[in-house]
């Protein structure tokens, strides 16, 4: 009996074990899938953690600022994004001077801040032939709320596909239309709390900063680094430091410099004002005052970011370059900007369409109609401005001044009390001296100069220049106003004179003869080339040359000029157009797929040259074909006007092909334009 029970028990256990094994075998695929999924998730998490950039904290006298590490060709760069340098310009601060802002005790600077409100009508101020790649690194989404923003739903730039391009001085007219806005034109991303800056620091290891993995020991790598502060362009109408074009990591890493790119107010929110000669509270020209405050912030704080406050180079493109030239001339900025020694100006200067005071003054002529257009009533400027402070920023950013007009600097404020020519006469080296000589032989000083033996006050080193095809966008914009199926002759003699009149040209026919000796049988391509050349000279090249002459002959400043002519592979034009020179400075060919090896080499050479100018004030030697030798980059003088052409074939000394045209333009255009 016992034996039988034992046998039965064995059979029972055997049957049960077999069933269990069978069940386990059936569950095996599910178990395998679960294990695989868990392993995959663990791998992804581990990979993400490995890729996650460590936080990098800088301690200032009032704050701990957290940035992040990025790698650029094996070089560590610390990136600080969206650091506020002024209070929000909303509410009572609208139309007023920027107010200094203290940093919070802890600040996360790992995400871009919002762009300033700006005009958005499908017009974007860049070169449509030169699309800018979006950056997966530079994103605008808010990061833990430490940087106040008007909207927490902003999308990263990488989520917005847009072909963008930029113009410069006075040029909502010189724009190309696109189907979608640039990310910084998106009203949902914009804010009046937009006065912030981005900083890139190469291989930062000084004692006031540490990574999250540090042992806590202070490290010091020696002297502070030179600083390049770069102001973006956009014709004073568009643009932002969130444009990937101004991503400073490559310039910082390869140049060994600290790079700072600030925001500033633009459009109506920057240039609507009261009669500012009696009311300092709403002074106008707020874009310039924002830039001034950004420079003050840099001088105060940049030492904490390994930057040398005694070696700051200020650079700009387009309206950013125009701003720098105006700062140089402003009597109010002398204490701040004149303390800086080196400047780099791309494609613009203080002279240009906006410098002509023949247009009505904003504060006296346009404040009332603008206010009426948005429902504000009242007779006095203070009352109208109080009302305008209650209007949405979106509405104000959309305001129009009329055909051929845009919001831009005016010359009636405490900061800019006179035209550029008038301001030059107020700078000591340009005043009449004991000998009775004047640096200007004519009313505006455009015709000739006398060398003065004076003790110079303005002692700066300036690198300034243009691209080979400055007028491409201006012609493209003009071409959009011309009806199709129209003859070349009609364009030249009916439509173009009206366009030139917007820029102060008094004798369009005479000016056309300078660029077109014979229009008989002229092809459309021939006309486009000539008119593009004309507009480029009028708006950009000649104003830049004029400032170079003023600075080099009116002071003992060292001025060097350049022309960049390399055709970029991503461009539809035959030679370099506006802002493609900025691409070389910021290393775009090094990060954009499809760039040619020649473009990459050229970008490295430009970064090296610009960085050495920032560090030492020195420039590379150039090739002189006339002597067959290499010589020092010559300074710019009125009798020599040497220009260095920069392209893939090197840095070459070339004759200034614009000189003759610029002198003729002086006689045919409004006095303060060229």
Where are these regions (language model features)?
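Active-site-proximal substrate-binding core of FAD-dependent oxidoreductases
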Residues: 626-644
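Serine-hydrolase-like catalytic core of hydrolytic proteins
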Residues: 26-43, 142, 182-381, 416-418, ...
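Bulky hydrophobic/aromatic "packing anchor" residues in well-ordered structure
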Residues: 85, 388, 582-584, 644
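Non-catalytic accessory segments of hydrolases
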Residues: 2-8, 12-288, 309, 593-606, ...
């Amino acid at each position: 009996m016992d034996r039988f029970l034992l046998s039965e028990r064995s059979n029972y256990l055997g049957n049960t074990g077999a069933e269990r094994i069978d069940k386990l075998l059936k569950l095996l695929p599910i178990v395998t899938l679960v294990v695989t999924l868990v392993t995959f998730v663990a791998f992804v998490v581990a990979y993400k953690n490995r890729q996650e950039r460590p936080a990098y904290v800088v301690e200032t006298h009032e704050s701990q600022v957290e940035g992040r590490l990025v790698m650029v060709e094996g070089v560590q760069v610390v990136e600080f994004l969206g650091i506020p340098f002024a209070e929000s310009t909303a509410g009572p601060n609208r139309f007023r001077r920027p107010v200094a802002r203290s940093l919070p005790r802890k600040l996360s600077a790992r995400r871009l801040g919002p762009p300033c409100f700006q005009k958005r009508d499908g017009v974007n101020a860049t070169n449509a032939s030169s699309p800018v790649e979006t950056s997966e690194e530079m994103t605008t989404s808010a990061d833990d709320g430490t940087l106040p923003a008007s909207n927490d739903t902003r999308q990263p730039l990488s989520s917005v596909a847009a072909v963008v391009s930029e113009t410069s001085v006075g040029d909502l007219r010189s724009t190309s239309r696109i189907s979608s806005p640039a990310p910084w034109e998106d009203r949902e991303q914009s804010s009046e709390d937009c006065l912030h800056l981005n900083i890139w620091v190469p291989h930062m290891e000084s004692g006031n900063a540490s990574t999250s993995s540090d042992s806590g020991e202070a490290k010091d790598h020696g002297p502070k680094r030179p600083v390049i502060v770069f102001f973006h362009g956009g014709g004073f109408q568009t643009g932002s430091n969130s444009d990937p074009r101004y991503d400073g990591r490559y310039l910082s890493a390869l140049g060994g410099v600290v790079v700072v790119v600030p925001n500033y107010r633009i459009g109506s929110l920057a240039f609507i004002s009261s009669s500012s000669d009696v009311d300092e509270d709403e002074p106008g020209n707020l874009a310039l005052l924002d830039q001034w405050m950004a420079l003050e912030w840099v001088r105060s704080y940049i030492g904490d970011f390994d930057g040398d406050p005694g070696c700051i180079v200020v650079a700009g493109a387009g309206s950013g370059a125009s701003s720098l030239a105006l700062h140089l001339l402003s009597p109010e900025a002398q204490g701040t900007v004149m303390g800086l020694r080196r400047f780099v100006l791309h494609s613009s200067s203080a002279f240009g369409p906006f410098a002509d005071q023949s247009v009505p003054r904003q504060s006296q002529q346009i404040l009332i109609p603008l206010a009426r257009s948005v429902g504000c009533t009242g007779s006095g400027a203070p009352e109208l401005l109080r009302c305008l402070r209650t209007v949405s920023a979106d509405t104000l950013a959309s305001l129009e001044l009329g055909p051929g007009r845009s919001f831009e600097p005016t010359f009636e404020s405490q900061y800019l009390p006179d035209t550029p020519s008038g301001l030059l006469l107020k700078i000591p080296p340009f005043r009449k001296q004991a000998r009775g000589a004047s640096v200007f032989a004519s009313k505006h000083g455009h015709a000739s100069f006398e060398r003065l033996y004076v003790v110079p006050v303005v002692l700066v080193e300036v690198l300034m220049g243009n691209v080979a095809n400055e007028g491409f966008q201006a012609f493209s914009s003009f071409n959009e106003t011309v009806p199709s199926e129209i003859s070349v002759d009609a364009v030249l003699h009916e439509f173009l004179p009206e366009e030139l009149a917007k820029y102060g040209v008094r004798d369009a026919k005479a000016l056309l003869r300078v660029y077109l000796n014979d229009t008989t049988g002229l092809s459309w391509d021939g006309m486009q080339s000539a008119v593009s050349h004309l507009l480029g000279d009028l708006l950009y090249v000649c104003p830049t040359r004029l400032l170079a002459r003023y600075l080099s002959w009116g002071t003992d400043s060292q001025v060097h000029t350049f022309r960049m002519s390399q055709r970029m592979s991503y461009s539809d034009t035959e030679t370099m157009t506006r802002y493609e020179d900025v691409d070389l400075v910021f290393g775009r060919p090094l990060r954009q797929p499809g760039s040619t090896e020649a473009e990459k080499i050229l970008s490295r050479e430009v970064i090296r040259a610009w960085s050495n100018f920032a560090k030492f004030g020195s420039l590379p030697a150039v090739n002189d074909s006339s002597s067959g030798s290499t010589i020092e980059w010559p300074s710019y003088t009125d009798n020599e006007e040497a220009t260095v052409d920069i392209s893939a074939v090197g840095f070459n000394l070339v004759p200034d092909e614009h000189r003759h045209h610029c002198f003729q333009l002086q006689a045919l255009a409004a006095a303060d334009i060229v």
